[in-house]
Each structure stands twice: as C-alpha cells, then as structure tokens.
Amino acid sequence: MIDLYTWPTPNGRKVSIALEEMGLAYRCHAVDLQAQDQFHPDFLAISPNNKIPAIVDQKTGQSLMESGAILIYLADTCGQFWGDDRYTTLQWLMWQMGGLGPMLGQVHYFKKYNAGKSVYAEERFFNEALRLYKILDQRLAETEYLSGSYSIADMAVWPWVSRFEWQGVNLKDFLNVQRWYEAIAARPAVQKGYDQPMYMNDIPKV
C-alpha cells in the first residue's frame, strides 16, 4: 500500500495518474495548500521542501518527495511505463521537471493570478511557454508519445498541458500536442487520477 499526500495541481496529478495507470494500491491524503497543510510537521517529515506530492510506500518503508523522483520509483516498482527507451523517457521527464513545469508555473503566476502587475514578466514567460509548446509539438510529430509508447514522461507533461487555458495557449495551434492531449485525456486511469484527492474541475476540452 502506498500513501499519497497530494492536492489537485499538475504536479499532484502526475502521481495519482501514474498510480491509477499502474494499478498500484494506494490511499490518498489531501494536503490542502490553501489551509497551509504543507507546513504541518507531520507532512514536513515526509516532504522537507513543503511541496506536494509525496509518498510513503508501506511495503518498503520508502518515503519520497518530488514528483519526478516518485514517478521513477513507481515505474521501477511496477516494471512498466518506461516507453521504448529508458533514457529517452528520462530525458523528457527532466525536460518537464526543469523547463516546462517551472516556466508554465510562472505563466500561471503572472498571467492568471497577477495579471497587469508586470507586463514584461507576462510576455517573457508566455513567449517561453510558446517555445516549449513548439518543442513538444515537434517531438510529437515524430512519435505517438514522448518516448514512443506511453510512459511516465507523458504522465509528467500532460497535467501541465491540461492547464492550457490558464496559459492562454490555443492547442489548435499545436495539432500534434492536441492529438496527444486528447488521447491521454480519454484514458480511464487518467480521468480517475485527475480527480484525486477530490474533484476540482472537469478535464478541459480543446
């Protein structure tokens, strides 16, 4: 049994989607970010960086923070979802962790939550988001999924793309991304994992 500590954010949804896809037994514990549950000492003992998601694998005693590390652990645990090549999968997972996620997070911060406070920041991060979407679209013109077959790299990237409306991005401008996004959105495990630890909103449609 795996205990998952999470909230309905892109990073949180990565792991709940992975657990559903892998069919691993888990219990979901809501960490309410608005109530600042992430600063509770019990949670900090698992995730010292006070960020969700985090897991505790009751079978092995392993606790982990950082969504990318958790995805790698889960893929190794179940022996699935490494795509056609482990290192290609890791490459795109790191691209998400180091580039796509942080940059789209800045778009959310400036464009959605603080619109008008810094035109420079809004434009800078929006343009970077478009650059990253172009890279993603080019990759998905070459292959069905990021690593050939469906993998943890797709599970990491997809929840961030699912907030395209927050980013002001039109997926119809990126037809390969749109095809990939809609295919993943139709997966039953993704639909179930998206609503953990609770329903927040429908999966956005293009």
Predicted regions and their residues:
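GST-like domain detector, emphasizing the conserved glutathione-binding G-site
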Residues: 1-130, 137
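Phosphate-coordinating loops and pocket residues in cytosolic domains that bind phosphorylated ligands
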Residues: 45, 186, 195
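Short secondary-structure capping/turn micro-motifs that flank functional sites
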Residues: 35-36, 180, 200-201
